[in-house]
């Protein structure tokens, strides 16, 4: 699930991070970019509910390489199983099951690229090194559909949320930005300075990042007992709650701002209880 830019095979093993400056970063709801000057790459990210979209613009004349590294771990994680494989001239699929914050964390992905790979090498079963012909200066766009259920659902998420856009990164970004504007327009602020209003809406944006949607576009999701279930149409299954410190203010605020979200969260928590008889 981690796409890391690298100059070649040697960096796959060294895993040396690329230097960057925070002054070269840009961030807004649904968008992030960083200019990796040392590597000669502009990396941009946007998203839909189940798909991550990458755009990499390489400086002309350098080797255009992407590393898909499913071996990458946080300090407290352990990989039970995982793999990456090529399933088309411009497509990769893969999965990983780990133990870390919780046990048995599944993630499946289908990644489609805006042009075929010039070459692909696999240093390990969970890594892929891709090269592209970018001599024309045309960027590489990558769409990554994810699911915690299976590969088929990851593909379905990818198709339903991005097929109508093709590989038009800017169009997806604009649609995502419009969705965020609707989310943030639930409160209208008057008065104060521009900096204070920016601070307020940034905090409101942060309040809407979690919990995460755990169900796929077909309604399927993986329960806490590892079985797969399907929710009724129109409802979302959520995960990644932090109720120990959100019950004081965040939850009361959501009962005022987003009752649909609150209802879905309550149903999600009840489902966790029913699947484990434990919260």
Which stretches of residues belong to each language-model region?
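Short, glycine/acidic-rich beta->alpha junctions
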Residues: 26, 47-50, 244-246, 257
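Long, well-ordered core segments of solenoidal/helical folds
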Residues: 211, 258-277
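Single conserved hydrophobic/aromatic residue that forms the stacking wall/gate
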Residues: 2-13, 277-278
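Extended, loop-rich substrate-binding clefts of extracytoplasmic carbohydrate-active enzymes
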Residues: 14-45
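Stable alpha-helical elements in mature extracytoplasmic
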Residues: 176, 245, 252, 261-265
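Acidic/polar, glycine-enriched structural segments that form the non-catalytic walls/loops
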Residues: 36, 41, 46-237, 271-275
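Well-ordered alpha-helical scaffold segments within catalytic/enzyme domains
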Residues: 206, 210, 250-259
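Secondary-structure capping and boundary motifs in well-ordered enzyme cores
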Residues: 195-196, 236-245, 258
